[in-house]
Design a protein with these regions (language model features):
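Sec-dependent signal peptide recognition
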Residues: 3-11
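N-terminal signal peptide c-region/cleavage motif recognized by signal peptidases
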Residues: 17-19
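N-terminal secretory signal peptides
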Residues: 23-89, 164
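Non-cytosolic coordination micro-motifs
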Residues: 25, 34-44, 50, 130-144, ...
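A cross-kingdom feature marking solvent-exposed beta-strand/loop segments within repeated
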Residues: 56, 70-72, 121-139
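Amphipathic N-proximal alpha-helical interface segments
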Residues: 63-100, 141-168
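Long, charged/polar, surface-exposed segments that mediate recognition or autoinhibition
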Residues: 79-131
Length: 168
């Protein structure tokens, strides 16, 4: 009986510490008590990436304003899916942010995607590895990096990673 009660308590505590529903990431962050500066930055990022999917927020159950939080949003498209992740780390009036956006497309090759990105921004630095199975695209200012990973004949996984230090 004690084991059964422990399992129920564990399930309830996990449910209370993890939110998974379709409200916005920034709304989840505010509701969970995440630092207001971090929540504001998350709102801006959410709008710039046009995130509108299933969201999950991980925040400390008793000290969410002072400790890092993790925010995830997944979306499905007619030609693939994407998952966005942001880690917010509060530091008094500042907030440090790392983001990762992984998009899987099943009807466009990595070569096509790479070519399109270079056409839009010719100054991008492009490096290919493992017989072209991986491509890293980096702007001159190193504000982000994109990794293209070949997925079969006509698919590609696009991973974009950023680290932000707003106000510092």
């Amino acid at each position: 009986m004690e084991l059964y009660i422990n399992k129920i308590l564990l399930a309830v505590s996990l449910f209370l510490s993890i939110n998974a529903f379709a409200s916005s990431l920034s709304d989840d962050a505010i509701e969970r008590g995440v630092n207001s500066t971090c929540s504001s930055y998350l709102n801006q990022i959410e709008k710039s990436y046009k995130l509108n999917g299933l969201n999950i927020t991980f925040a400390h159950p008793t000290n969410s304003a002072s400790l890092p939080s993790l925010h995830i949003s997944s979306q499905k498209y007619n030609n693939g899916s994407s998952t966005f992740s942001a880690t917010l780390t509060p530091d008094k009036e500042y907030c440090y942010i790392s983001t990762v956006l992984v998009t899987s497309v099943n009807n466009q090759t990595c070569s096509e995607i790479s070519q399109l990105k270079i056409e839009v921004a010719p100054e991008l630095q492009v490096s290919r590895y493992a017989d072209g199975n991986f491509t890293i695209i980096t702007p001159k200012d190193n504000t982000y990096q994109i990794i293209l990973t070949v997925q079969g004949e006509t698919g590609c996984t696009i991973t974009e990673a950023r680290m932000l230090w707003p106000g510092r």
